Amino acid sequence: MYTNYSDWARWFWKGAVHIDDVAAAVILSVDLISRQQLRRHLILTLDSAYEYTDADLDHWDADGAGSTFKKYYSEYYDLALSYGLDPALKPTKLDISETVRWLGYRPSYSLARLLSEPGSL
């Protein structure tokens, strides 16, 4: 349990999946097994949504510390710093291609939502 939104944001910032995305994946999974009998147990990876492109991640902060964050969230840069969030921290994007293929999973919660939530931080 987190005492406030900013504590939760610091945890999410490191790489996490929002409960809404987990719930969506569970519903999609139940739908899948109700439609077909699987020959094997699936192990599927969930991840957050990202505004960053693969090219952004491959060339993270090529223009200086925090530059990739500023490219997408410049209006939140000072806010992020004020709450101890590191805009230079490169996210670890997990491979969810099998999850997308099997379930049609599309995560919706990203840093953009985290930073723009009403009353956030």
Predicted feature locations:
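Short, low-complexity, polar/charged sequence segments that are solvent-exposed and flexible
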Residues: 9-10, 63-68, 113
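Amphipathic terminal alpha-helices
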Residues: 89-91, 96-102, 106-121
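C-terminal/domain-terminus segments
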Residues: 1, 7, 38-41, 45, ...
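Residue-level detector of transmembrane insertion/anchoring sites
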Residues: 8-11, 87, 100
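Mid/C-terminal beta-alpha module of Rossmann-like enzyme folds, strongest
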Residues: 23-90, 94-96
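Glycine-rich loops and low-complexity Gly/Arg-rich segments
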Residues: 13-14, 69-72, 115-119
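Substrate-positioning beta->alpha
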Residues: 1-31
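Broad hydrophobic/π-residue packing in well-ordered secondary structure
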Residues: 14-18, 26, 41-44, 105, ...
